[in-house]
Amino acid sequence: MCAVLAGAVVLAGCTSPGIPTPPAIDATDTANDEPVALATGLDAPWSVVRLDDGGALISQRDGGEVLELTASGDLREAGVVPGVVSGGESGLHGLAVLERGDMRWLYAYHGAEDDNRVVRMPLTGEPGSLGLDVAAVEVVVDGIPRASNHDGGRIAFGPDRMLYIATGDAGQRERARDRDFLGGKILRVTPEGDPAPGNPFDSLVYSLGHRNVQGLAWTSDGTLWASEFGQDTWDELNRIEPGGDYGWPDHEGFARTDDAIDPVAVWTPDEASPSGIAVIDDVVYVAGLRGERLWLYDTTTPSVEPWAVYTGEFGRLRDVIAGPDDTFWVLTNNTDGRGSPGADDDRLLQLTLPEG
């Protein structure tokens, strides 16, 4: 097995003693400049989405609020997603925006009374005064199992303009590999919520055998990557294949069997507990909750193990996205009931891209 780098991370295919171990990379070697706080005082934020005008939208889990961060740095409430039921890890989760003709839609994944669901509603107004037309809410996908934990919740439009939805097993681990169960899956749907053309099982399901996926992003070649919470042993970074079975609950981490696809890299939960991910220059950035760090994995040089930056500097990290001008944005998550909030938490931070 490969030597551990910056913690207990293991890379797929690194069992040969002939492969040299790269030098450990410390956060001080790769992180540049001081962070810029773009927003402070956030309450259990979960997702951040940049807008074309330079602003952003931020979801707050427990209250269902969608906040607008304007390009000039002002923070205001755009609206509240109706029907959000919060409790435990459930509430308002991922956001995505789609423009079609003259319509601009906000998509949101949230907990409801009896399930998790994805809804959409028109995003109205101009930058600086955006609003949610909650009277025109449409259900895109419902019937996703909901529980106090393992709710998944990340949504993103792929290069094919289809909507990808990350779900958790909602504690029903025995059904994560069941194609007829929406939990423990990555779903792929049209913007209206129908099975996307070319789906492997002629259903909403794109991949299965997941425990709790919370990160989705694509490299430049169109490959989908996903982060996944493990149980007690291994968290995972997976390269997603259409129809792929990733083995949960029968396998966690590297199974090396014919009935499941192994992850590309794994971490112990105390060093990762991965949530949102981003791809910047074909490097995957993984936000760690318990790990309180960012993990980076260069998909163009798979023989090099992931390395960590900003370890312990900002507390729990929930989401990460590309920023402007060689920067990236990180959303902290210290007010979710499991962190130790600082005076300005939670925050949206802008950081300079690491070197090397």
Predicted features by range, described:
Residues V205-D232:
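Repeat-solenoid scaffold signature
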Residues M1-A8:
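Sec-dependent N-terminal signal peptides
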Residues L11-G13:
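C-terminal motif of bacterial Sec signal peptides marking the signal peptidase cleavage site
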Residues R76-G88, A135-D151, V189-L208, G244-P269, ...:
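Surface-exposed loop and turn segments in beta-propeller and other repeat-based domains
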Residues T15-Q172, T223-G230, E271-W307, I321-G356:
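Acidic, Gly/Ser/Thr-rich repeat motifs that build Ca2+-stabilized beta-propeller blades
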